[in-house]
Amino acid sequence: MEVTFFGTSAGLPTKERNTQAIALNLEPYSNSIWLFDVGEGTQHQILHHAIKLGKVTHIFITHMHGDHIFGLPGLLSSRSFQGGEQKPLTLVGPKGIKAYVEMSMNLSESHLNYPITYIEIDDHLTYHHDGFTVEAHLLNHGIPSYGYRVMAPETTGTINVEALKNIGLEPGPKYQEVKSHDTFEHNGQVYQSKDFRGESKQGPVVAIFGDTKPCSNERVISRDADVMVHEATYIDGEKHLANNYHHSHIEDVFALIKEANVKRTLITHLSNRYNTEDINEIYQILIQNEDTPNFNFVKDFDSFKV
């Protein structure tokens, strides 16, 4: 899988950064793209990338602030003409997301040529699709804001060839049945496939956060995540300033990384007060501390393998 950022600024765009938008490429598990938040100008950002709107099957909105949703109506309209015709879309988000989209379409007399399934979250959500499990949990941002825990399908354990040979089953097409089915038959006897496979391995876990100040659900969402995408609107200065506005400070994120045993953290939603030079200088200062966990300040069009 791969995470790509189409917008990394907080609140307002800058000359260097667009407002929030993240793409999650599900390959090799699926040929689909999932978007998380669609800030103003997202569809224009996507034009500079190989991702096609027709491959976007799901959009997850973290919360209803404008820097996370103002690009949604335009992107949905353009999807009709960029490979999305008759391809269903699932839109997940807080209560009000359906009304927002439908009102925008109605008032602009825009017409989509594909169906949308709306899923509005009430406190929390567990959603299953193509072997993936997505959990949404409420954060603390003053308005309903959610974090998403995306769990890829389990990888089936390796076939124990010697054990199969011991029952007289030599390598061949039957091995695929052992790998992909719960049971298989050989010489008139039914066997449990799990007895001839190694332990299954949980697929990668990606945690993607909406805006929030520290809260207990953060640890639920990010526990043992392979990759965490988290906001740090404030990356210097006093922490209470961030928390007073229901946002996170870089110190909050570092604490969460350690508490939740996160392997890699990608920090986005940086205040427009910081330019690229500021961010690079702060990064160099932070990594001088041996206690600083593994993280990156991301910029628009950055991509990271999961």
Swiss-Prot record:
The keyword Iron-sulfur does not apply. Zinc phosphodiesterase, which displays some tRNA 3'-processing endonuclease activity. Probably involved in tRNA maturation, by removing a 3'-trailer from precursor tRNA. SUPFAM superfamilies: Metallo-hydrolase/oxidoreductase. This is Ribonuclease Z. Belongs to the RNase Z family. InterPro entries: RibonucZ/Hydroxyglut_hydro, RNase_Z/BN, tRNase_Z_dom. Zn(2+) 2 binds at residues 67-68, 211, 269. Homodimer. Binds 2 Zn(2+) ions.
